[in-house]
């Protein structure tokens, strides 16, 4: 992780803007591992530790990756990947598959220096019986 956060990247607002824009992506699970990101993107983007307020991370029964859902008075720690291109975002969409929906969220950099808009992947089924309470542990699956 970089010790100083790069300038925030503006997230594209409309589909016509997205082909040439760069994106911030908040990650909180398997994409925290640089090795996973490197395999997918063929590079490791600049990143900064961040917090997503108003969400909770869940373990998913039988899976090595977590899910997040909106839950008041909770927070998810992770990191923001900066400068993600549209083709790279498409790769993340395929990797995350249909179990997740890409959403725009506001995250706070962990050092408290600023808030910024980012994309993240939210579990699509908030009534999924396989969601387990208790935070997912990044170290356990790997």
Q: What residues fall within each predicted segment?
A:
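Glycine-aromatic micro-motifs
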Residues: 1-142
């Amino acid at each position: 992780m970089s010790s100083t956060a790069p300038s925030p990247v503006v997230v594209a607002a409309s589909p016509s803007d997205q082909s040439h824009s760069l994106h911030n992506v908040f990650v909180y699970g398997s994409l925290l591992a640089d090795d996973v990101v490197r395999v997918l993107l063929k590079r490791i983007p600049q990143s900064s530790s961040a917090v997503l307020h108003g969400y909770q991370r869940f373990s998913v029964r039988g899976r090595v990756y977590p899910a997040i859902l909106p839950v008041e008075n909770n927070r998810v720690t992770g990191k923001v990947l900066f400068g993600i291109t549209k083709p790279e975002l498409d790769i993340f969409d395929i990797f995350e598959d249909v179990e997740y929906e890409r959403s725009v969220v506001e995250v706070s950099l962990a050092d408290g220096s600023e808030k910024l808009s980012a994309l993240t992947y939210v579990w699509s089924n908030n009534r999924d019986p396989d969601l387990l309470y208790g935070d997912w542990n990044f170290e356990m699956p790997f």
